[in-house]
UniProtKB/Swiss-Prot annotation:
Source organism of this protein record: Thermoanaerobacter brockii
Keywords: ATP-binding, Chaperone, Cytoplasm, Isomerase, Nucleotide-binding
Catalytic reaction(s) noted: ATP + H2O + a folded polypeptide = ADP + phosphate + an unfolded polypeptide
Keyword Transmembrane: no
Enzyme class per UniProt: isomerase
One Pfam family this sequence matches: Cpn60_TCP1
Record protein name field: Chaperonin GroEL
Amino acid sequence: MAKQIKYGEEARRALERGVNAVADTVKVTLGPRGRNVVLDKKYGSPTVTNDGVTIAREIELEDPFENQGAQLLKEAATKTNDIAGDGTTTATLLAQAMVREGLKNLAAGANPMLLRRGIAKAVDAAVEGLKRISKPIDNKESIAHVASISAADEEIGKLIAEAMDKVGKDGVITVEESKTLGTTLEVVEGMQFDRGYISPYMVTDAEKMEAVLEEPVILITDKKISNIQDLLPLLEQIVQQGKKLLIIADDVEGEALATLIVNKLRGTFTCVAVKAPGFGDRRKEMLQDIAILTGGQVISEELGYDLKDVRLDMLGRARQVKVTKEYTTIVGGAGDPSEIKKRVNQIKAQIEETTSDYDREKLQERLAKLAGGVAVIQAGAATETELKEKKHRIEDALAATKAAVEEGIVPGGGIALLNVIEDVQKVVDSLEGDFKTGAKIVLRALEEPVRQIATNAGVDGSVIVEKIKAAKDPNFGYDAYKEEFTDMFKAGIVDPTKVTRTALQNAASIASMILTTEAIVVDIPEKNTGMPNPGAGMDMM
């Protein structure tokens, strides 16, 4: 297919127009008085959102050269969202500011490679500055503040703080759509997996149709159990000690299942059997997780164990096990805390290494089940459009809160970036020529978020920036919601350090890429010739 090419200034200006198309659409959503953007959907009702990355993903431009710029900026937003889960609008805005200033300097004859190195030096100084002013976040109130600001809703903030308090920072918190109007929180303690009892005859509470075993022993195996002879030696020991038994196996069927049910109905002993969770290699890993959590061993031929040889001390133990038709929950596993910690660290290392989003999600789930628990926030609203928008906000707030727990918090409202201007100024003063010009590009861009938040609130951004700079107080800033100057930390207006840092680094990366671009190659769009005319006059036979 033939290509068309643009070079030099013409190419960069096309990229800039693409960047502006995305940034101008996204930046109206910044801050507490940011506006919404309506996204057209081919089917169904339009989506109303103020989430930067959701808006950016929808934008495709007709001009292929400009579209390259739009796609590059989208990358900055998406990368920020993937790493920090929030800050996409800030990243977009910073990148636009750096591209605008950079192109002015290139037009004046600056060397793009030196500009790039100047930008990198300035960003490094800004990141160090952010680390310096960052404060750790450890109490429930601070967590609620961060979540409330991201979601622009105090109620959601409190729910997220409550969820994180219950399941810990390694726990999994998921957001689901509720069938009711209200937004609620549900917490599952211990390890839960999506497998229920093999037979309804195993229930201990016929009214609720669930089996609850107090202080049971747990047989964990990857084998299919169909012959009761394999289990007899173990069952005799369990009956003698009056224990209750949970079997987690590949399957329990035939004679073995019938015998277990008959003995349960006669009241000889209580036993519940469930199928092992997961599939393939993931099943082996999950069985090992359960074994470590309960202090038992996986009975597997791979490890040289046979069911006939199982002793009581090889079984896991827990405070309580609850089994419903669909789920099994193990609470208070009796595993060795140091072994559990080792396993948690091993899963964390795998999360760092994996490149697959699906694998990462599954590893996060396993980590949560071992480390804390699972919390589900049920988002409810009056209409489907409102529900989608609310779910988006909760997911954003959740990501921002996790980022805050990881790296701490800085004053919000764009003030943190103004606070690191001094750090960047020192770098600017130490450089010369185009290096210095590159660092100055970042210096100017750092003011942009405060300026835009103020503009969205209907006030003059430049006046606000100058007032904040003149105050010389690191926590002094502009509360756009109340339209007043205040101490940002005291007012609870804070941003996660990780979000601000990631937004700045990704914006600089994309801006540097655009400034050092010398040519763009795109396909020449094919002319649509239309469908060939079918043979006329042919009767249908």
